[in-house]
């Protein structure tokens, strides 16, 4: 209908706002990574009052949501612009346009693995013919992804590596700090999986085992993504203006997304085969459990691979003793409340 077409066309007004916001955010990420999170807070905080105005006051419906999201980007753009102005004070040199166009495939290739990864939901839905399993998966994912927040700690290393600073000591400290955040968040998700699901909805309580495997995967991914950032941040192939296409193909800027692409493709193939074999004889919770196990196992070899590459490129030493003690203390700290919780919590259907 004409109304639907007008709504689709109105989405075009969001594109410039998102475009400029992401560009300025990327500039700040290279030298002031904390500003990226300031911008996110400003962006999300601006959406709420503007949505109230467009939806409640003016009653604009879907078009009001589009306008609100567009306007909400403006404060975030201004914030990023204030911090980024030191880096964009020179005039735009159009001689770099050819190089930008030549290398425009690289960011797209980097995001291809993420697109491939999202197909697991589609595969599960097609094979099972239902979205019931997705409900259990989504509920478990809300609890399991808590440890993802630890990945923010590694963001500050990337700009330091771009500045060509001595990286070994920086990486060693970053891995330690990353562990200090990731370990407790992981243990919280695992030990309190059942209460977390019960709080969302009692019918999801049976998927608590799913959270354990999802949490393991999230924890592994936090480390593998940090290692990937170390590798790409240390790559200098894009510093020279005369870098050839072949040099980019051989660089870590191409290696890391290619490795992820292989990983996710293998994961999807394995998931498809397993679901086709066990679908008729399994419940939805069991199917989601298989899904989470395959997801976790697919991350392990690539964590090892990225770690080997990091060890080859940097000199650092893991603080195994301190991290082991920290892990044991965390297990005791969260394990005791877990075993005592049945005395104080009742899980009624």
Each language-model region and where it sits:
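Helix-loop junctions and terminal segments of transmembrane helices
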Residues: 29-30, 145-168, 174-177, 228-239
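Interfacial segments at transmembrane-helix termini and the short loops linking adjacent helices
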Residues: 1-11, 190-222, 237-238, 242-248, ...
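Hydrophobic alpha-helical transmembrane segments
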Residues: 38-86, 138, 144, 258-273, ...
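Interhelical loop/hinge segments that connect adjacent transmembrane helices in multipass membrane
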Residues: 9, 34-38, 62-68, 78-118, ...
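Transmembrane alpha-helical segments of multi-pass transport proteins
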Residues: 43, 113-114, 290-295, 321-349
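Membrane-interface junctions at transmembrane-helix termini in multi-pass inner-membrane proteins
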Residues: 16-39, 163, 216-262, 268, ...
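Interfacial/gating helices of multi-pass transporter permease domains
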Residues: 5, 62-63, 99-103, 121-144, ...
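Interfacial transmembrane-helix starts/ends
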Residues: 101, 158, 162, 166-191, ...
């Amino acid at each position: 209908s004409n109304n639907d077409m007008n709504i689709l066309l109105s989405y075009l007004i969001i594109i410039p706002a998102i475009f400029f916001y992401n560009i300025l955010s990327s500039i700040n990420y290279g030298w002031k990574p904390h500003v990226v999170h300031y911008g996110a807070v400003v962006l999300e905080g601006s959406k709420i009052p503007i949505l109230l105005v467009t939806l409640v006051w003016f009653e604009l419906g879907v078009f009001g949501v589009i306008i609100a999201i567009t306007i909400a980007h403006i404060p975030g753009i201004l914030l990023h612009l204030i911090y980024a102005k030191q880096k964009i004070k020179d005039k735009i040199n159009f001689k770099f346009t050819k190089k930008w166009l030549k290398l425009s495939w690289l960011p797209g290739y980097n995001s291809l693995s993420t697109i491939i990864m999202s197909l697991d939901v589609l595969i599960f839905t097609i094979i099972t013919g239902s979205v019931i399993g997705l409900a259990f998966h989504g509920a478990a994912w809300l609890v399991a992804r808590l440890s993802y927040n630890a990945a923010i700690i590694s963001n500050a290393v990337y700009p330091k590596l771009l500045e060509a600073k001595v990286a070994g000591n920086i990486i060693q400290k970053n891995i330690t700090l990353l562990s200090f955040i990731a370990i407790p968040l992981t243990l919280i998700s695992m030990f309190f999986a059942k209460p977390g699901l019960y709080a969302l909805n009692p019918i999801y309580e049976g998927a608590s085992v799913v959270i354990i495997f999802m949490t393991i995967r999230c924890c592994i991914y936090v480390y593998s993504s940090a290692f990937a950032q170390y590798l790409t941040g240390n790559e200098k192939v894009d510093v020279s203006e005369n870098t050839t296409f072949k040099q980019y193909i051989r660089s870590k800027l191409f290696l890391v997304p290619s490795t992820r692409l292989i990983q996710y493709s293998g994961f999807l193939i394995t998931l498809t085969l397993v679901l086709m074999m066990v679908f008729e004889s399994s419940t939805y919770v069991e199917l989601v459990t298989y899904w989470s196990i395959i997801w976790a196992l697919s991350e392990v070899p690539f964590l090892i691979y990225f770690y080997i590459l990091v060890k080859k490129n940097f000199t650092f030493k893991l603080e195994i003793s301190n991290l082991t003690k920290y892990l044991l203390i965390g297990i005791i700290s969260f394990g005791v409340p877990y075993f005592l919780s049945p005395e104080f919590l009742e899980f009624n259907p």
